[in-house]
Amino acid sequence: MTECDVQMYMPVNVVQSGTDFECIVKFTNLRSSEDVNLLLCYASIHGEMYLDYVLVRVTEFDEVQRQGLLNKRTMSGLVHIPKVSSSYSVINTLNGMIGNLFGVKQASTLTEASEQKQENAIPVLLTRPDILGVDITLSPGEEKCFRLKRRIPLRTAPTYKGLAFRFQHALVIGVQSATNNACVEHEFEITIVPNVQQQPELPLGKNSGNRQSSKLFADLSKPIIETDAAEIEEVSAEKARRQFGKNGIRLSQDAQEEEKQKKKYEQHIKKLLDGESNEEGGGEFQDHGMRSEINEEVLEEEDEEKIALLKKLESKQPMATRFEITSKQKVLCRLLLSKSRYRTGEMMMIELEGLDAMVRQVHMQLESVERIVPDIRIRNSVGTERATRKVWCRITRGVFELENMSASMVVPEECPETFETQQFGVEHFLRVELLRAVNKKREMQGPAHPRYSEEVQSPSRSRYSEEVQRVSEGRLSEEVSKEEEKKGGRESGQHKRMASLTNSREMQIQHAPTTFAAETIQCVLPIRIEKRVVWMEDGMEGGMEGMQPV
């Protein structure tokens, strides 16, 4: 372990792919009463994938795993550090145990440090180690801050922790001290989400057959290897606080660019007032602006083409927010959503209009499933959906004698975002289930009767009183229930069965009458979920101590 503390500060809780990842890395000497000498400090971003061998053919990624390990060995050879001790000793064992408990990993060389991963980890993103500082001396209580800025590739797989697959990303900071030859690596988890424009309204599999899919979505069979150097700058604590804005909230990109242009303009005016020639001052100002424009074009030209293609695909199939639920050629209700995309922590408003008089209860729930392309999955689509299905929020309402109903649900913060890669994806659905009483006379008459005539011929209140009377008098025999169960057990496009006091369905509709002949109609509506971006408060000032290594 090192004698200094390592902390990392981020302006936001998530980083979008295709944008710049920016953070402040701070080294502080708080443990030693003497000067601490750090020979080498470096930083790198690692992204790894973990697969479940029960649901995914892991053997398809063996070559990817070997290639990623080879790239780690190639990209981690900054310096060669001799091993601490080649022989086994109790002290080395205790040091390793203590290091694992405190979230640090020790290795003799940088190559060994890069290979200290789990065996089933498959690399998806590797960046070259960027040197933060060399031969740094920290006196007791002194701190050193470095600003790191790197562009995250647009085709980076987002961070996700699921059942069939997991994607994890971390900022790895390595420290080599003079008192200890072992290289210590600190890992800070970072969350990468899909780009705002990288969400076309197409289900998984549609883009996999597209010729442009290799340019749009992450191909996990080919890990991303970034060899470009990141922007490293040593900054003071005060400058770091200013860059992150007041109370640790970082200024936006536009505000920072506007502030830079304002300072350049003030310097240019000052040079003119001091008597310098207009040509020299103006030429320098114009050349600098032209160089910055050229650099921006080179960096963002390729990403802009990809985003433009994504927008083109998105405009072809916009998602609907108005649906009609039908059964046997009759509209049971109309469902309205406030919008087709929701952010985590946002309220989802749902309205039901024109409910059928026979509908007794409505159940709605937000759920997510993991999708795997057929080439690498072990089970079929139904088995994979059952194994990976998660319910995030639900609501049940009684709608007896109601024509309209409004409901709201809050999308939990821990709900993952909707995303897609060429091999995997996560989709979200709003599952709606209607519990509808069965009327034999009405079934024989046909579905063309309007609502008002149905109420006149057999009012809902009289039907309800008749059912209560039948239950109280006990005239519902087992033979009648068995006969109705046989008739209601047939499925004709919907999930149809008998509803009783103990309903064994997955939806678990409750508060129904004791016994009555009924059917359940289910439907799933596709929606999209996005992660909410939260600006970190108090950043490098006051109470926040920064992100600690895991």
Curated annotation (Swiss-Prot):
Write out the ranges of the annotated region (Disordered). 247-266, 272-291, 442-502
For this chain, the annotated S-S bridges are: none
Task: State the GO CC annotations.
Answer: cytosol; Golgi membrane; nucleus; Ric1-Rgp1 guanyl-nucleotide exchange factor complex
- Pfam families xref list: Rgp1
Tell me a GO biological process for this protein.
Answer: positive regulation of TORC2 signaling
From start to end residue, where is composition biased (Basic and acidic residues)? Answer: 463-494
Miscellaneous: Restores G1 arrest under starvation conditions to sat1- mutant.
This protein is called Protein sat1
- Gene name, please? sat1
